[in-house]
């Protein structure tokens, strides 16, 4: 897609200058100072064929948010040269009084420590943003997102930039497996066994399109994996935080879209359903869901004894992370002799968990087997927190793709959810691939998804008739080492 040659970001003369801004002290991180000009020197960002998008515009955004909402802007020497696990990094703490902020308000910003722009090529800068959100219990909470800036910025005819929020399938109940840290190592590793390249390679490909790319830690600081409301809120509020930065600077408007595959669709689908009531004014103009998961607990039988059986444990611990009564019940039903092994998923990284529990009978960890998981106390929680397809009708256009022979997440529930959304008036293109399975559809669906996203970002998409288009397709991309999503 051709790049717009005029991409220099213009600052409004009414915005505060750097010299007008102050940096607040933070009792957790120590005293910051006003030398932000030196501490946040950013690389130049090429724009289009001849223009240069000046990072000063983004620097103004980082500083302006401090004055507007009390965010704590940190110098590079306050954070670490190399990233620390979130549970050990004092930056991953909300400042006092964050509960009084509004969802999407920025609480902290820093340049991502270490070599993230080297790990993720095609990125000119990367930021960690800590923002106010809402947890699964509808209580004030916070989360972190990682924002990548491309080397060349695409602008739509309206002059808006394109922001793609990609929700990774984090599949972990360990806070230290959050994407903001995982991007440095486990998400930067290829998976030769499955013939898949790293997530960071895929992010680099997205950046090459000229899009801003957002990767939220949608499960939050408690790693509430599988809690759809938590993930949906965090996805929405990460976008709100970025749009808030842009609106403060007057630098650029944003056309935002959301995308997730497999476990990432839980956050993406929840955000789409929550948007009409939780954030009706947010500008999310499109959503893509591949290999869609509609009911986390409904897939336990197919996951049990599979290579990814650990996902069952991560889900049970993640969904109950913010619900003490349900967590207490869950732990009370574990076989004492293997309880510690089950609970170790809270502390080991997701890859080690997958290897350790591959092929295992997870139901055997419970005193009464699967019956303990089917108890009303857990099923009621799953019904309230771990399903999509039962909320509001998503208001944005959607592209949904899935392999008919998906062996990990059967297609039947997806068909039902799509039909419900269609009956409610949603604008959906749903493609059911006649070839491949869950893993193959990662690559088979990617070109179609990107092509559809371009129609959203270049503002050429228009509602079609009928509003829902459901079709079987036969798409097989040649086997190669490809980006894992």
From Swiss-Prot:
This is Probable trichothecene esterase SAT6. GO terms for molecular function: triacylglycerol lipase activity. Trichothecenes are sesquiterpenoid toxins that act by inhibiting protein biosynthesis. GO terms for biological process: lipid catabolic process. The keyword Cell membrane does not apply. The active site is at 262 (charge relay system), 406 (charge relay system), 438 (charge relay system). It is an enzyme of class 3 (hydrolase). Its EC number is 3.1.1.-. Keywords: Hydrolase. Belongs to the AB hydrolase superfamily. Lipase family. Probable trichothecene esterase; part of the satratoxin SC1 cluster involved in the biosynthesis of satratoxins, trichothecene mycotoxins that are associated with human food poisonings. Satratoxins are suggested to be made by products of multiple gene clusters (SC1, SC2 and SC3) that encode 21 proteins in all, including polyketide synthases, acetyltransferases, and other enzymes expected to modify the trichothecene skeleton. SC1 encodes 10 proteins, SAT1 to SAT10. Residues 9-23 have a biased composition (Low complexity). It comes from Stachybotrys chartarum (strain CBS 109288 / IBT 7711). Residues 1-23 are annotated as: Disordered. Pathway: Mycotoxin biosynthesis. PANTHER family: LIP-DOMAIN-CONTAINING PROTEIN-RELATED, PTHR34853.
């Amino acid at each position: 897609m051709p790049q717009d040659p005029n991409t220099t970001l213009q600052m409004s003369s009414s915005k505060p200058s750097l010299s007008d801004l102050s940096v607040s002290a933070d009792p957790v991180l120590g005293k910051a100072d006003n030398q932000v000009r030196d501490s946040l020197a950013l690389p130049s960002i090429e724009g289009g064929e001849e223009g240069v998008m000046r990072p000063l515009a983004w620097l103004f955004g980082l500083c302006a948010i401090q004055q507007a909402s009390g965010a704590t802007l940190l110098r590079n020497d306050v954070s670490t040269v190399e990233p620390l696990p979130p549970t050990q990094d004092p930056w991953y703490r909300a400042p006092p009084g964050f509960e009084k902020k509004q969802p999407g308000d920025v609480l902290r910003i820093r340049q991502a420590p270490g070599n993230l722009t080297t790990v993720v090529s095609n990125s000119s800068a990367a930021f960690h943003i800590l923002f106010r959100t809402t947890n699964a219990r509808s209580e004030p909470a916070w989360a972190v997102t990682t924002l990548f800036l491309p080397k060349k910025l695409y602008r739509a005819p309206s002059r808006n930039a394109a922001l793609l929020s990609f929700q990774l399938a984090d599949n972990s109940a360990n806070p230290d497996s959050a994407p903001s840290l995982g991007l440095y190592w486990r998400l930067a590793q290829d998976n030769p066994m499955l013939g898949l390249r790293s997530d960071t390679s895929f992010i680099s490909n997205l950046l090459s399109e000229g899009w801003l790319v957002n990767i939220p830690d949608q499960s939050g600081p408690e790693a509430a994996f599988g809690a759809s409301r938590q993930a949906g809120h965090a996805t929405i509020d990460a976008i709100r935080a970025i749009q808030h930065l842009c609106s403060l600077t007057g630098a650029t408007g944003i056309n935002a879209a959301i995308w997730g595959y497999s476990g990432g669709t839980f956050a993406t689908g929840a955000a789409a359903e929550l948007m009409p009531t939780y954030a009706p004014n947010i500008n999310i103009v499109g959503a893509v869901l591949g290999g869609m998961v509609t009911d986390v607990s409904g897939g336990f039988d197919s996951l049990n004894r599979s290579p990814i059986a650990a996902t069952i444990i991560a889900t049970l611990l993640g969904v109950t992370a913010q619900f003490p009564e349900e967590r207490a019940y869950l732990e009370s039903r574990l076989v004492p002799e293997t309880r510690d092994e089950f609970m170790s998923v809270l502390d080991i990284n997701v890859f080690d968990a997958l290897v350790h529990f591959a092929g295992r009978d997870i139901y055997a960890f419970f005193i009464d087997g699967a019956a303990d998981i089917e108890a009303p106390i857990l099923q009621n929680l799953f019904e309230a927190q771990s399903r999509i397809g039962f909320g509001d009708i998503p208001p944005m256009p959607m592209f949904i793709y899935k392999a008919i022979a998906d062996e990990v997440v059967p297609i039947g529930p997806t068909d039902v959810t799509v039909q419900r959304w269609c009956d409610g008036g949603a604008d959906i293109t749903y493609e059911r691939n006649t070839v491949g399975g869950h893993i193959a559809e990662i690559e088979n669906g990617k070109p179609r998804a990107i092509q559809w996203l371009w129609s959203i970002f270049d503002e050429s998409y228009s509602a079609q008739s009928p509003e829902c288009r459901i079709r079987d397709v036969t798409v097989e991309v040649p086997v190669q080492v490809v980006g894992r999503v």
